[in-house]
Structures are given as structure tokens and as C-alpha cells.
Amino acid sequence: MDGIIPLYKERGMTSNDCVFKVRRILHMKKVGHSGTLDPNVDGVLPICIGQATKVVDQLVHSGKVYTGEITLGLSTTTEDLDGEVVEEQQLTEPISTEKIKETLASFLGESIQIPPMFSAVKVNGRRLYDYARAGDPVERPQRKITITQFDLQGEPEFDAKTGRQTFRFIAGCSKGTYIRTLAVDFGRKLGLPAVMSDLTRLKSGGIQIGSCVTLAQLAEAADNGQLADILIPLDHVFEENVKIALDDDQWAKILNGVFLTFPEQTEEILALTYEGHIKALYQVANAKQHLYRPYKMYLQNQGTH
């Protein structure tokens, strides 16, 4: 059985919990997820099974879309509401809608982000959250991220009693972006403490939340022999790649890992198909000669079965 399960991860579960439960439901070991979601975050979590586990890296590197909420007026150790409050500053008046929109827009494009201490990023073989819990000092790595969308959703809400303001947003971003940290950085630009107070992943790996299934729905489909109705073929991952249909001679060469020439092509990566399915990714080896070399092989890919 091969394919991608468009799973909706519920809150209170880790991504690895989901993998474990899918293994039990499907009675198979070859299962992997394509991008960690924190326990307090729900939304799209593509689960790869069988041959599709070979495309986990491609899914991980895809862009993501989130919707969530930022609260101005307090900050925590974890940059969300799970941590201990480390700073509070009451707002005497609300930040204007125009100022919020302007500040959100300032994040668009490429920038450098430092991941939060309570994160799974590894430094010298240890997760940052291990350093944080042990109280050990560590220099966090800088990451280049790209924000493609950061828009206000609805109207901001101001609570005069608590001196806090909340607003919802939608954000499109590159792999490895921490929305928690975006929330903190947003507040910093306004001279205010801030936290991410809610988050849902709407899209990952080209999979929208509306097409996802819960673990309970997956189990029901498995019991009823209807998994094929849920599984997304491995080929879905490469929808945006330029595709080349191979003839029999080229296919024979692919099987032997031979370099191939595609005179009309200039793309960095080509998705090569045979009998209607992606069989390999080839990467440019010599641009002037239009020569391509093997990059990723999916020779056993037959779609979902």
C-alpha cells in the first residue's frame, strides 16, 4: 500500500503520536510524517506510507499556510500560551487596524529568523528544548525564511480590563518558519510583548485542510476497505514540476541510472514519468548541453494501491 494520507491532526497529539496510530490502524511499519506540528496546533499533517515515504523530504520542503491568533500584552517562555509568562505590559489603547496591517506587511519576503528555545531544532545533536529544560546555554542557529503572505483576518479585539489586544491572521511561509517567533517579532516591532495564542495549519504539501481526514475516519475507511478513496498518489507531490514522458528506450536507461539529454529543457529539476507515473527526478548536470543526471528515484511507484 502506497500513497499520502491527508491527515487532520487534532490538538493534544504529537506528530509522532499520529504516525504510531496510523501504523496500528494500517498494520504497517513504513509510515512517516512530513513536518512536525506542535501538540497544541491542529491542521494538515501529510502522512506518507509505503513507497510514498521516499517523498517525505519533498513534502517537508514545500510551503505552508497557517491561520492563527496573536495576543499583544504578554510574552512567555515558549512563545505560545503553553509556557510561563515572563513579561506583561498592559496596552492603554488599542493598536490601530492600519498599524497592524502595516506591521504584518513588513514581514513579507526573505528574512533571518532565530528559532525558539522550546523547539525541536538540533544543535550538536541535542534538541533546543533539551537545552532549555536543562538550563544549558546554547547559541541558536539563524535560518533564512520567506514569508509570502501575512494578512489580518477580521477585526482586532481589545480588552480594556486586561490591557491586551488580539487579532487573527493568515500566513504563508517557507519550510522551517516558526509562527510563534513571528508573533514575538511582530510585538517587538511595536515595542510590546506578544505570543501566538492559537494556530491551525491550513495547507502543507499542496494538501488543503478541507480534504483531510481524522484518525477515526481513517480507521473507518480501513475497516470498510475504502483506503483507496483517501490515499493521494505519490505523483501529487510533483504537480508543479515540469514532467517528461519517457519512451521505452529512455526508461531502460533510467533503470541503469544513465544521464539523459533533454534539448528543449532548462529547468533545474525534471520529473520523469513512465506509464503515467513519476519514476524519477533528474537534476541538471550540464546546462549548456541540457544534460540531466539522476537525483531521486521512485522506480516502484505505481500510484496508490
Curated annotation (Swiss-Prot):
EC number annotated for this UniProt entry: 5.4.99.25
GO biological process: mRNA pseudouridine synthesis; tRNA pseudouridine synthesis
Pfam families xrefs: TruB_C_2, TruB_N
Organism: Latilactobacillus sakei subsp. sakei (strain 23K)
UniProt family annotation: Belongs to the pseudouridine synthase TruB family. Type 1 subfamily.
Name of the gene: truB
PANTHER family: PSEUDOURIDYLATE SYNTHASE TRUB1 (PTHR13767:SF2), TRNA-PSEUDOURIDINE SYNTHASE (PTHR13767)
Keywords of this entry: Isomerase, tRNA processing
Highest taxon of source: Bacteria
InterPro entries hit by this protein: PsdUridine_synth_cat_dom_sf (IPR020103), PsdUridine_synth_N (IPR002501), tRNA_psdUridine_synth_TruB (IPR014780), TruB_C (IPR032819)
Top EC category: isomerase
Catalytic activity, reaction form: uridine(55) in tRNA = pseudouridine(55) in tRNA
Gene3D superfamilies linked: Pseudouridine synthase
Protein name: tRNA pseudouridine synthase B
Keyword Isomerase: yes
GO terms for MF: RNA binding; tRNA pseudouridine(55) synthase activity
Task of the protein: Responsible for synthesis of pseudouridine from uracil-55 in the psi GC loop of transfer RNAs.
Annotated catalytic residues: 38
